[in-house]
From Swiss-Prot:
Gene3D superfamilies registered for this protein in UniProt: Phosphatidylinositol 3-kinase Catalytic Subunit, Chain A, domain 1
Principal place of residence: nucleus
GO biological process: auxin-activated signaling pathway; regulation of DNA-templated transcription
Keyword list, A-Z: Auxin signaling pathway, Nucleus, Repressor, Transcription, Transcription regulation
Protein encoded by which gene: AUX22C
Induction behaviour: By auxin.
Assembly behavior: Homodimers and heterodimers.
Compartment(s) where it occurs, according to its Swiss-Prot or TrEMBL record: Nucleus
Domain notes: The N-terminal half of the protein contains two conserved domains I and II. Domain I includes a slightly degenerated ERF-associated amphiphilic repression (EAR) motif which seems to be involved in the activity of transcriptional repression. Domain II is required for the correct degradation of the protein through the SCF-mediated ubiquitin-proteasome pathway. Interactions between Aux/IAA proteins and auxin response factors (ARFs) occur through their C-terminal dimerization domains III and IV.
Protein name per UniProt: Auxin-induced protein 22C
SUPFAM superfamilies noted in UniProt: CAD & PB1 domains
Domain PB1 positions: 79-167
Motif (EAR-like (transcriptional repression)): 13-17
Length: 188
């Protein structure tokens, strides 16, 4: 008895893809095992447009595909995300400066992020506060938040840091009433 008579060809171990068959495949079987694109299925009978389809298959136009509403939203509004860290807080936050209209909105957002660490009291009483908000500009210099106009701050800010006053002395950054515009926005 031969193997074909017993039906053992299904359980036979081969190198290759399952269902690919042996070496005695015909051209019809080889074409059957290849994957087909939707355009191949749609236009199987029309051979006149075959050359044009082969050229368009090789082109990858918009990959990865992005929804049109997402394209519109990302093009119109640039995002200005900045990392915010606070001394004593075990986590960092990211804040979008483009969403805020001024220092008062930023102060309110920081109060929401770090309210449990007493940032509200620190921002209200800048002269006696335990914490001082500072930022790093494009040049790598640390400056007090509120020293420059809001638009200049938005353009130059790379990251924000709320540090302890004792550490800010090392940077030679001490608030002298310069945070009044920043502090007025903190609401309770």
């Amino acid at each position: 008895m031969e193997k074909e008579d017993l039906g053992l060809e299904i359980t036979e171990l081969r190198l290759g893809l399952p269902g690919a068959g042996g070496e005695n495949n015909t051209d019809k079987d080889k074409n059957k095992n290849k994957k087909r694109v939707f355009s191949d299925i749609e236009g199987e009978n029309s051979s006149s447009e075959e050359d044009g389809k082969k050229e368009t298959k090789n082109q990858v136009v918009g990959w990865p595909p992005v929804c049109s509403y997402r394209k519109k939203n990302t093009v119109n509004e640039p995002k200005l995300y900045v990392k915010v860290s606070m001394d004593g807080a075990p986590f960092l936050r990211k804040i979008d400066l483009a969403m805020h209209k001024g220092y008062s909105d930023l102060a309110f957002a920081l109060d929401k992020f770090f309210g449990c660490y007493g940032i509200c009291e620190a921002l209200k009483d800048a002269e006696n506060a335990e914490h001082v908000p500072i930022y790093e500009d494009k040049d790598g210099d640390w400056m007090l938040v509120g020293d420059v106009p809001w638009e200049m701050f938005r353009e130059s800010c790379k990251r924000l840091r709320i540090m302890k006053r004792s550490d800010a002395k090392g940077f030679d950054l001490q608030p002298k009433g310069s945070l009044k515009g920043f502090i007025e926005g903190v609401r309770k």
